[in-house]
Curated annotation (Swiss-Prot):
InterPro entries: Amidohydro-rel, HutI, Metal-dep_hydrolase_composite, Metal_Hydrolase. Zn(2+) binds at H68, H70, H238, D313. It comes from the Bacteria. Keywords: Cytoplasm, Histidine metabolism, Hydrolase, Iron, Metal-binding, Zinc. GO terms for molecular function: imidazolonepropionase activity; iron ion binding; zinc ion binding. GO terms for biological process: L-histidine catabolic process to glutamate and formamide; L-histidine catabolic process to glutamate and formate. Its cofactor is Zn(2+); Fe(3+). Its EC number is 3.5.2.7. This is Imidazolonepropionase. It catalyses: 4-imidazolone-5-propanoate + H2O = N-formimidoyl-L-glutamate. Fe(3+) binds at H68, H70, H238, D313. Pathway: Amino-acid degradation; L-histidine degradation into L-glutamate; N-formimidoyl-L-glutamate from L-histidine: step 3/3.
Length: 407
């Protein structure tokens, strides 16, 4: 690959629409790393004569980061969508064997090749919107062989597509049917057999747990966190989605990368997250899809300075969403975030939620040249439009990996 000077662009280098350069340039080394960013009038002499790529006045942002997804699974759950429309709650469906457990059955029955093919169809729309890094969780296998297949497929997606994939082991997602009434025994299996085996195979970047009334208790969640700590793995938590169970405070005690959902988060949990540097990952797609009514405590998070990230939470039961731009719109319209908060939420703060702030979410010398090109007049349009393709080009490691004739 040759070195390139990208020019005639408007630059939002760090995901903050209030910190931009109107006439900017980006020098990218032949190895795909950024050599320099700044005003076009200040291009250092060493880069002036490099081959140029004219972006015709478009905006450039860091590649987007989807920091919470369940992208790999078998089947779909449109039938449960119809049940919810008829009045059934998420908890009611789960308690009678639907919900997560129905996807577990479909995932266990699917081959690795079938899981890969289905996941590809879900990933492509995200990549076309400028996503260059994504987190993918397991958690629909709930036994070693199926969890392994899910994580292997996630790794394969990162090898086959121009996207950095971060894998999260979510064995403690739900209680599998064969362990009904024996949750502690299942946590034994997660901590003593599944996690060690998958970590030894290099399939796990982080560990998550669903701490909720219909999930796992604080004590069980802590056992999973302890098992992760023994392996030197960072942790995350699904917390306070359906009730205030104190999960966020536990996550903070283990210096979790993130606590996610958080509709029922209280002031004590917010303060704990601030003290531990834990990112709040908000998931407006799930909030919208299950018709939740309790909003996350946005003002408390702001007041305490807790970083807010946004993610699709793509999953078959509560957020079959494959658009991070629509997620931004929902974050603004439903959660009343500002455009600044929404864009930071899918760039810099989303990278922090993955423990990858040194690799993603910002454009600076020495980092990989992962960026998205937007032929819009203002960055507010990224959160304003929905159902309209906006991304003109995606660059990953200095190489154009997606283009759309948007003009």
């Amino acid at each position: 690959m040759k070195s390139i000077l990208w020019h005639n662009l408007k630059l939002c280098a760090h995901g903050d629409p209030n910190d931009t350069i109107a006439d900017a340039a980006i020098a990218v080394n032949g190895d795909g790393t950024i050599a320099w960013t700044g005003r076009a009038s200040d291009v250092p002499a060493g880069y002036v004569h490099w081959p140029r790529e004219d972006l015709r006045g478009a905006w450039v942002t860091p590649g987007l980061v989807d920091c919470h997804t369940h992208l790999v699974y078998g089947g779909q759950r449109a039938d449960e969508f119809a049940q919810r429309l008829a009045g059934a709650s998420y908890e009611e469906i789960a308690r009678r064997g639907g919900g997560i457990v129905s996807t577990v059955r479909a995932t266990r029955d699917a081959s690795e090749a079938a899981l890969f093919e289905q996941a590809c169809a879900r990933l492509r729309p995200l990549l076309a919107e400028g996503v260059t890094a994504i987190e993918i969780k397991s958690g629909y296998g709930l036994e070693l062989a199926s969890e392994r297949r899910m994580l292997r497929v996630a790794r394969q997606l990162g090898e086959r597509f121009p996207v950095s994939v971060y894998t999260t082991f979510l064995g403690a997602h739900a209680l599998p049917p064969e362990y009904a009434g024996r949750a502690d025994e299942y946590i034994d299996e997660v901590c003593e057999r599944m996690l060690p085996a998958l970590a030894d195979e290099g399939l796990v970047d982080a560990v998550d747990v669903f701490c909720e009334r219909i999930g796992f208790t604080l004590a069980q969640s802590e056992r999973v966190f302890e098992a992760a700590a023994r392996r030197g793995l960072p942790v995350k938590m699904h917390a306070e989605q359906l009730s205030n169970g104190g999960g966020s405070a536990l996550a903070a005690r283990y210096r979790a990368l993130s606590a996610d959902h958080l509709e029922y988060l209280d002031a004590a949990g917010v303060a704990a997250m601030r003290a531990s540097g834990t990112t709040a990952v908000l998931l407006p797609g799930a909030y919208y899809f299950i018709r939740e009514t309790k909003l996350p405590p946005i003002d408390l998070l702001r007041r305490h300075g807790v970083p807010i990230a946004l993610a699709t939470d793509h999953n078959p039961g509560t957020s079959p969403l494959t658009s991070l731009l629509l997620t931004m719109n929902m974050g603004c319209t439903v959660f009343k975030l500002t455009v600044q908060e929404a864009l930071l939420g899918v760039t810099r703060h989303a990278a922090a939620a993955l423990g990858a702030s040194d690799r993603h979410g910002s454009l600076a010398p020495g980092r990989q040249a992962d960026f998205a090109v937007w032929p819009v007049s203002t960055l507010a349009e990224l959160a304003y439009w929905f159902g309209r393709p906006l991304c003109e080009r995606v660059v990953k490691g200095g190489v154009t990996v997606f283009t759309r004739d948007a003009r």
